[in-house]
From Swiss-Prot:
Species whose genome carries this gene: Zea mays (Maize)
Regions crossing the membrane: 52-74
Protein name (record): Cell number regulator 4
Membrane topology: Single-pass membrane protein
Principal localisation: membrane
Length: 159
């Protein structure tokens, strides 16, 4: 049985197809900073770490509650990057509207889209067979030595 990559120009799952991947669904609704950070890391090709993107999302989420939903503007920029990368249509409506009214569903859809296209956000930017230090954001949040570990890991790994 051979598998073909999904065609460019169309989404592999719908906005409300959250239950096709229970992990991304639960994370997107209970702790959206984690799947969003993973998506941002993949879309930025490692230039933004999972932890940093997730932390910024949380700060914007709580800072903008009273005035403007700042996190929607931040997350819709990544939806635009994803759409540009795979030539996806703005469905079901404009990117900012999707993130404003269906934020967790939109984050879950972005996560699933990358996963269905072969770039598993849970693995970070690394190939599936290698250990990724930024894959679950644990090191960023728990270790004060994160940057030293990451620098040494890249030195050993890429030599």
């Amino acid at each position: 049985m051979s598998t073909y990559p999904p065609p460019t120009g169309e989404w592999t799952t719908g906005l409300c197809g959250c239950f096709s991947d229970c992990k991304s669904c639960c994370l997107s609704f209970l702790c959206p900073c984690i799947p969003f950070g993973q998506v941002a890391e993949v879309l930025d090709k490692g230039m933004t770490s999972c932890g940093l993107a997730g932390l910024l999302y949380c700060l914007l989420l709580h800072a903008g509650v009273a005035v403007v939903p700042c996190h929607c503007i931040y997350t819709c920029t990544y939806r635009r990057k994803l759409r540009a990368a795979y030539d996806l249509p703005p469905e079901p409506c404009a990117d900012c509207c999707v993130h404003m009214w269906c934020g967790p569903c939109a984050i879950s859809q972005m996560y699933r889209e990358l996963k269905n296209r072969g770039a598993d956000p849970a693995m970070g930017r690394q190939p599936a067979f290698s250990l990724s230090l930024t894959s679950h954001c644990r090191f960023f949040l728990k270790s004060k030595y994160y940057h030293i570990i990451k620098k040494n890991w890249r030195t050993v790994k890429y030599g």
